[in-house]
């Protein structure tokens, strides 16, 4: 299969074949990262702008390192240092960036759909590094890559996503990707944080941790955002941890080869106990490692269409 998109905006729009192509390409780039010399000339002569209008550490650093390993020229921009603070519109800002003959814009924004809006209006490639509560496609892809690497495939696999599904772009990207590849998906958390409409697309919804994880092959625990407590979505962090935090006694009742995942940053002893995060079933740090290969793959594939 050939990649034909100049943008990566979300997993909702991708076919199973396109997702698999990204994962296969990432597997090749992971081999590059394991060599002594980790750099390849795939994006030499191309310029990538990392435009993060919303704060980020892991995703921004991962993208920047991926770009360096592909030999791209890199420009890092943040909203605080841009003309957005002077009243310039987002579209005018990115139009001016494009006028400098850049090839790719990697963007994170707090507004849902911001990347889709600018991608329709730019000739350069746009990669979504997270938009509002909509999607975080490269996080979804690195989670899929990690699952495939550990489990061999997705058909019939039981994957449970626990936490704040309502506000999570990570959850949405995971759900779309997992369903397209044939996994069975369960989402669980407080009723205020788990929309029932997911049932309409074949996702199992429950509000009990034990029910969600007993038959799971993979458990992906999402960060609880403390700011949601002030909005009345749940009584308190302690109560959330009591009902939905994954602890060692529960692990003993689960499948012995279950994968424990988390997109980070972790709130230890809230979403999961420290001993679970650091335990033998945890692949959390492997997710971080795999994110580099996945982002190299995405940059490489999208850049190939921009060149054309």
Language-model-detected regions and their locations in the chain:
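Phosphate/diphosphate ligand-binding glycine-rich loop within oxidoreductases
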Residues: 37-145, 268
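Rossmann-like adenosine-cofactor binding region
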Residues: 198-275
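Positively charged, low-complexity intrinsically disordered leader regions
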Residues: 1-65
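Adenosine-phosphate binding glycine-rich loop
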Residues: 257-258, 263-308
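Glycine-rich phosphate/diphosphate-binding loop of Rossmann-like nucleotide-binding domains
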Residues: 53-65, 149-222
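Phosphate-coordination loops involved in phosphoryl transfer and adenosine-cofactor binding
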Residues: 43-48, 155-159, 257
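Short, structured coil segments at secondary-structure junctions
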Residues: 70, 121-123, 181, 199-201, ...
């Amino acid at each position: 299969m050939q990649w034909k998109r100049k943008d990566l905006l979300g997993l909702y729009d991708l076919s199973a074949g396109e997702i698999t192509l990204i994962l296969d390409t990432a597997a090749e780039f992971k081999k590059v990262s394991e060599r002594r010399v980790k750099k390849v000339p795939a994006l030499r002569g191309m310029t990538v702008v990392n435009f993060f209008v919303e704060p980020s550490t892991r995703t921004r650093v991962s993208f920047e390192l991926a770009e360096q390993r592909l030999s791209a020229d890199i420009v890092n921009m943040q909203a605080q240092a841009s003309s957005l603070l002077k009243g310039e519109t987002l579209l005018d800002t990115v139009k001016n960036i494009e006028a400098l003959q850049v090839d790719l814009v990697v963007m994170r924004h707090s507004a849902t759909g911001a990347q889709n809006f600018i991608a329709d209006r730019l000739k350069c490639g746009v990669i979504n590094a997270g938009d509002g509560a909509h999607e975080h496609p490269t996080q979804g892809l690195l989670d899929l890559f990690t699952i495939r690497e550990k489990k061999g495939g997705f058909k019939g696999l039981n994957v449970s996503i626990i936490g704040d599904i309502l506000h999570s772009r990570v959850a949405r990207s995971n759900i779309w990707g997992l369903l397209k590849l044939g996994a069975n998906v369960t989402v669980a958390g407080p009723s205020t944080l788990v929309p029932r409409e997911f049932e309409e697309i074949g996702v199992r919804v429950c509000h009990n941790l034990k029910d969600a994880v007993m038959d799971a092959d993979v458990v992906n625990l999402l960060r609880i955002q403390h700011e949601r407590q002030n909005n009345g979505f749940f009584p308190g962090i302690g109560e959330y941890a009591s009902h939905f935090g994954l602890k060692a006694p529960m692990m003993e009742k689960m499948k012995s080869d279950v994968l424990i995942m988390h997109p980070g940053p972790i709130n230890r002893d809230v979403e999961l106990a420290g001993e679970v995060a650091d335990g033998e079933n945890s692949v959390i740090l492997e997710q971080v490692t795999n994110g580099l290969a996945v982002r190299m793959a995405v940059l490489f594939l999208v850049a190939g269409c921009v060149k054309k």
